[in-house]
Amino acid sequence: HPVNRRQRQMCIRDSPLLFPDDPDVQKVKAAFYDPFEYLWMRHKGEALKTNFAESLGNIAYQVACHQRVQNIGLKTRDILSLIEETTVIAHERCSGHDGTYAVKKETRDKSVKIARPTVRKVNDQKPDHFISDCPMAGEHIAHLADELDSAQHPMTLLRVAYGLK
């Protein structure tokens, strides 16, 4: 069952800590996946259609912090890399957003400083697309970057690759 990151975190990390001996909680934990983690499992089981209609070119991908914390791996990159004539460069650095950190007056400058290394890498890459699994992180980096209007969600690009505009 693909779910958003907060739901997944609650079901696979928080609830099992609160109710470690509850078998129903363990069943729920085993049933939750990050969307690209789920798609990767389908691909490994030869159940994911990979007859993509369009290539995506050069993609800069900011790996969301929650994915590193949840040990998901780079499944988003792996799935998008299945698309012909598509290169995905993963940037595993902090966006500096952290919920409200980037929008609070007292922490905004620190947030920008934290994001700078990632923004530089994205600027240097000159991507056709910029993505992040975290909408807030993606928009923060896109706003700070030289030539990006906005970030795209990886699912949006996958939809484009399948020809479902």
Residue ranges of each PLM-predicted region?
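Single conserved hydrophobic/aromatic residue that forms the stacking wall/gate
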Residues: 1-8, 12
